[in-house]
């Protein structure tokens, strides 16, 4: 099974400091100044831990495709699974990075695309 993974590394950073969302560089910077904590990577890590336990019991072979750095690569590397990075985000990440990642990974023939935000 071919699985695509895209993580919004900035998700949750605004909500944790009483901002409504985290879209845009200005809101992300304000959230960081208020010690906002992004939640996307933590959510993805928790999801993958559970998924990999289930998959391991079923002996299903997985092929992962993801985007670079915090948009998938870092979390998959921490889980010690084989994966392919199909591109890299700009820094800081923006909505355009998510759109590009989803488009490229979907076009790579994955069976399912998992988005964590």
Task: Give the location of each predicted region.
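ATP/NTP phosphate-donor binding region
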Residues: 1-112
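Short, acidic/small-residue loops that bind anionic groups at enzyme active sites
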Residues: 116-117
């Amino acid at each position: 099974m071919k699985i695509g993974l895209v993580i919004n590394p900035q998700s949750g950073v605004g909500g944790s400091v009483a901002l409504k969302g985290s879209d845009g560089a200005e809101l992300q910077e304000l959230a960081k100044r208020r010690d906002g904590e992004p939640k996307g990577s933590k959510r993805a890590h928790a999801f993958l831990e559970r998924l990999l336990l289930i998959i391991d019991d079923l002996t299903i072979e997985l092929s992962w495709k993801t985007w670079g750095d915090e948009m998938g690569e870092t979390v998959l590397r921490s889980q010690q699974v084989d994966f392919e990075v199909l591109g890299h985000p700009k820094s800081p990440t923006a909505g355009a990075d998510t759109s590009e990642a989803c488009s490229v990974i979907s076009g790579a023939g994955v069976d399912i695309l998992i988005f964590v935000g």
